[in-house]
């Protein structure tokens, strides 16, 4: 919440509303001061050079922002290493994805060491396929089977 621009008193009120817990501004400040460097380090950590599969998708949430309920998306990249170990490569909060957005995400993965992705499993998000083809041109792109079933069911 702090990283997204909420001030400590807003976070305090949010925690009170959601969980019924009372925390002071100073407690929120101390927690964020300790957590932010750890989160930043995780977001910038080096990644494997090759992933067998990378899943790219979004989860949509309704959240309260400035007194209104708005829809936000958390975009996520989960990789499966060549030895089968799963790894959350990153999570990004946004309102809508675009080719430019996905290019920045994929270039960020490349800058963190990902040189090749064998298969990208995607959920049909706007601009994602074009961004993958631009950054990782040899990657096979496979639409997620769940998304295929949902899309097909609309026509049955």
Predicted segment positions?
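Conserved pre-catalytic core of RNA-dependent polymerases
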Residues: 1-2
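Short, charged amphipathic recognition helices of the HTH superfamily
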Residues: 5-15
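RNase H-like nuclease fold core
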Residues: 14, 18-126, 130, 134-138
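Short, surface-exposed amphipathic charged segments that create phosphate/polyanion-binding patches used
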Residues: 70-71, 154-156
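Inter-helix linker motif
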Residues: 136-154
